[in-house]
Amino acid sequence: MTTLMVQGTTSDAGKSTLVTALCRWLLRQGVAVVPFKPQNMALNSAVTADGGEIGRAQAVQAQACRLQPHTDMNPVLLKPNSDTGAQVIIHGRAVTSMNAVAYHDYKTTAMQAVLASHHRLSAAYPVVMVEGAGSPAEINLRAGDIANMGFAEAVDCPVILVADINRGGVFAHLVGTLELLSTTEQARVKGFVINRFRGDIALLQPGLDWLEQRTGKPVLGVLPYVTDLHLEAEDGIDVRQGVKHERVLKVIVPVLPRISNHTDFDPLRLHPQVDLQFIGPGQPIPAADLIILPGSKSVRGDLAQLRERGWDKAIERHLRYGGKLIGICGGLQMLGREVHDPLGLEGAAGSSQGLGLLDYATVLEAEKQLRNVAGTLSLEAATVTGYEIHAGVTTGPALAQPAVQLADGRHDGAVSADGQILATYLHGLFEGSQSCAALLRWAGLEDVQVIDYEALREHDIERLADLVEKHLDTVQLRQLCGVA
């Protein structure tokens, strides 16, 4: 059994992408490999085969390994629900919410969960490919670290350090990170990968030679800047769009402070007939065909922000002029009459008035609903697949006209009597080609082009593995992975 860890000099250095690429590259070599991230902080999560939730990046990495996502792949998930606190999820299940100080004291317990998951995976797979978090050189976070070198030291694994040259200062990032590590941690770093390079590699070579001489460690390769990958962003919202047709459907997503699972909108962002715009603070909601209220980790807080920004009035105006409206998960809850949080799960306990556009109310409960689902959209009887991640229980007359008939016999969500509003708890609504096309037609798009989003993602994973083959030192990589 071999464990290899990828750490980065900064957030968004390319750790998730490199782990995905290495997983598929190893799979091509006939090696059974499994992804692992000890601790992830993200509001984008996926439901696993064993009924828990993990970061979406690990779900994509599981796809690269052709495995079903499992909670052991990301044993600690932190989902921020305020500026100073987060919901702590251990082995796929929410434990409690903590502020940063309380979580620091909890790290010893969290590390036990991390090591237990790693032990199970390493017993089942020849190679465990690990992704770190942020940077290993954050001085204020090094005590009790479980996400980077603290984990690497605990399991005694080698580390590859990746840096993003597109940011500038790549040599300072690599050398500075290395020098802030302890002597034993420095020895774990077996080589560097430089990511997102544009230009003539010959012009970079003197810098690579200097880096190897300065550190005594090899550069394992330089990966090129790639502009058109369709893989989900780990943290920030990706606003890049594909080439658009002349006649497009205008879709608006209001971005609220605790937006969750914004990867729901990636298929729309990439669709050639959809002009997707994310609207932030200080921006009015422009005229559009469709507005989508996204998921939220703090529904009542985000509702207050929505009203403060005047977006509630803009939504009412949008409906008066015949526009369509979708609410997903937290967005569904906002569309109802009331949202009650008696246990203070998402902040201070209490109740808030919803937008009152659909006749139902939601009570947040401690036990989350976590499941992968399939069913049929009430629109056009289109097949839909997705996943539920929510603590709310919603009841009311509007649910008598559901948005989705689920295969397990349950109903999900609601469609308004006038057909303008659709509410659902299902994330991943637009990933299926049938459901995406049906929803776009409902919103007013004619002659919808059917896009196979899953095929796009699979194609990009293969492209990443091709980049490993072409640009990295595969001989040294095989040695680091313990593969003959």
Swiss-Prot record:
The active site is at C329, H427. Pathway: Cofactor biosynthesis; adenosylcobalamin biosynthesis. Signal peptide: none annotated. Keywords: Cobalamin biosynthesis, Glutamine amidotransferase. Residues 248-435 form the GATase cobBQ-type domain. One of its GO terms (molecular function) is catalytic activity. It comes from the Bacteria. Belongs to the CobB/CobQ family. CobQ subfamily. Catalyzes amidations at positions B, D, E, and G on adenosylcobyrinic A,C-diamide. NH(2) groups are provided by glutamine, and one molecule of ATP is hydrogenolyzed for each amidation. This is Cobyric acid synthase. It comes from Pseudomonas putida (strain ATCC 47054 / DSM 6125 / CFBP 8728 / NCIMB 11950 / KT2440).
